[in-house]
Structures are given as C-alpha cells and as structure tokens.
C-alpha cells in the first residue's frame, strides 16, 4: 500500500495509475485490485489486437462496464499487417509487433498524461525464471523493454518498404522521459501472494469475465481444457493469432502453450507430473487449420508458403525417425 499512497500524493493528473488491459483474466484482476484494494484512480489503456475475437470484445466491454475510464489504442491496421507479415518471415513470430504496441501504449499514455504509476501484471522474470533477459526479478516494470521480444528493437521495421519512423510511434516508449518524471512501474504479482493464472481466472469470473466453454476441442487450441486448472478455457482469448503463434513456437523450440500450462499446474499442485506429460504429448503444438487459414488470408500468403516458412525455422530438437516422421527430442526428456 506504500506505493499506492506515494502515487496518490505525487500525481499531477486526474489519475493515480495507468494499467494496460485486454479484458482478460489478468488485466481484469489488476484493474479491480488497484481500484478496490489499493484505492487508486485508474486509467486503463486497451491495445486492440488485430482480428479481435467475439469473446475478446465481450471481455473488454465487460471491464469498461465495471466502472473505469478506458482508452483504446489501435495502431494503423495497414501498417500492422506489414509488420506482422515481416515478423512471420523474419522471425517466425507473428505476434512480435503486437507485443511492442501492447507494452508501449501504456507507457506512452502514462508519459503524455503525467501519471506517476504504471501497473503491470506478471513479471516473467519472477514467474518463469526469465530474469536473464535483463528484465530482472524485482518489482520494477520500467524494465519491460528488456523482455525477450522487445529487446530486438523496433527500428528493425524501418527496413520494410512503405514503413517510416512516424508509423511506429506507438511501438516504443521513452524510458528516459518516464524516469525524469520519477514515474514508478510495478509488476503486481511481486506484491500479491495469491497470484496464479487459475486464481486470476476465478477472481475475474466473479466480475463478469467470460472464458471458453469446457466443450472446446483441445486439439484446436493446442492445450487441455477439462483437466487441471482448465487453461484452455481462459488463456489467449482475445485474438486467434496467438494460437498460430503457439504452433510456430512448438516448431521452433519443441514446446508450445500446453507445456507452459502443464508447468503452471504442476506448480499449483493441480496436475501430477505423469498427468502433465500425457497431456503435453497429446495436445502440445496442435492448432485448428481454420486459425492457420485465417492467418494466411490475413497476410495474403498460401498455406503452402506458411508451412514452407515454418520448416525453415524448425529447431534442432526435431529429428526424423525410421518412418520419416518428425520426433521431438524435448519429449525424450519427459520421463
């Protein structure tokens, strides 16, 4: 509560804090906690993803209706399409550009409105052990630019024909300006003992957050739905682009979101290791062909081009077996 008290005393604006939100489980919890537990006046900033889903639209509208001021930001869709296509072919990571904009939009609004405090949800350095990326394991979220995706600078996009620096304003923030104003940025999970994905989903459902039905086909989203904490019902709801990205992650690194979710659930004591391994081998890397076709149509490529490009990035954990089928050596480690 010390930091909340500091924000209220030091604000030069109508707001004590700014929070980046999608309307998903985590941002719903962040916003409600900041307002109701910490007593902060919050300005919510919503980065609208490309191809927002019906459930994603419902959830962001639901969060607005909980009684918040919300600014929605959507970078030029024509430019975003160029960036997403570029990132697919260059990095096999079609969500890279959206992550730049997703993070930066909150910081830009904070700077423009002179708001003293930025609240983010989960520090990957703390929960995933990703601290070697430079983001650290402390409470300071001004380090967000050091996250794996964001550290490969946005200037990379200037090599794209038809893209100028002015087009990329919403993709980067001025950390020096924020620091000169003594802006503080915190990861909320650093301060909350009861932070978990499952807990955030349960908490947010009480405030109208809607998840996928339990009848969802786990093969379509590449993770389990009925077991453990039911992650398939509440992860990655606002755009189908993330499902395609998880498939591509699986091809590059040998694991997708099912592995991520199973690790969380083992930590939470909601799955045994054996149950988790079985689920990973069943669903990891699966993705509905509808999502793939939708993505190919969006960036104007054929599905053949999609698969040929994905193959170029296939990680060395994949080996061909005697039947000429790909075998994932990561799974050999799951004993």
Predicted feature descriptions by range:
Residues 1-16, 33-335:
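Nucleotide-activated chemistry modules centered on ATP-dependent adenylation/adenylyltransferase
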Residues 17-26:
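Short, glycine-rich nucleotide/cofactor-binding loops
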Residues 29-30:
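Hydrophobic positions on the alpha1 helix immediately C-terminal to the Walker A/P-loop
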């Amino acid at each position: 509560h010390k930091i909340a008290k500091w924000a209220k005393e030091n604000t030069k604006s109508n707001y004590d804090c700014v929070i980046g939100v999608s309307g998903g489980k985590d941002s719903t919890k962040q916003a409600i906690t900041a307002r109701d537990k910490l007593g902060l006046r919050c300005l919510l900033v919503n980065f609208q993803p490309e191809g927002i889903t019906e459930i994603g639209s419902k959830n962001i509208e639901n969060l607005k209706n909980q009684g918040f001021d919300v600014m929605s930001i959507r970078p030029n869709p024509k430019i975003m399409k160029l960036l997403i296509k570029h990132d697919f072919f260059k990095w096999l990571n079609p969500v890279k550009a959206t992550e730049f904009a997703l993070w930066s939009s909150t910081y830009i609004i904070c700077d423009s409105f002179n708001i003293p405090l930025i609240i983010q949800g989960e520090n990957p350095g703390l929960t995933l052990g990703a601290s070697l990326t430079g983001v650290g394991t402390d409470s300071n979220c001004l380090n967000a630019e050091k996250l794996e995706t964001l550290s490969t600078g946005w200037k990379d996009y200037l090599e794209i024909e038809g893209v100028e620096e002015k087009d990329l304003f919403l993709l980067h923030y001025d950390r020096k300006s924020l620091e000169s104003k003594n802006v503080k940025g915190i990861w909320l999970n650093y301060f909350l003992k009861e932070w978990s994905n499952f807990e955030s989903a349960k908490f947010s459902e009480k405030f109208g957050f809607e998840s996928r039905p339990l009848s969802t086909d786990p093969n379509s989203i590449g993770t389990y739905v009925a077991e453990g904490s039911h992650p398939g019902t509440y992860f990655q709801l606002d755009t189908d682009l993330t499902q395609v990205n998880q498939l591509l992650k699986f091809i590059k690194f040998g694991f997708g979101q099912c592995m991520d979710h199973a690790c969380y659930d083992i930590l939470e004591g909601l799955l045994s290791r054996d149950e988790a391994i079985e689920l990973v081998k069943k669903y990891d890397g699966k993705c509905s062909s509808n999502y793939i076709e939708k993505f190919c149509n969006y960036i104007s490529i054929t599905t053949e081009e999609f698969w040929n490009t994905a193959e170029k990035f296939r990680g060395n954990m994949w080996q061909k077996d005697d039947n000429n089928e790909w075998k994932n050596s990561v799974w050999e480690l799951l004993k």
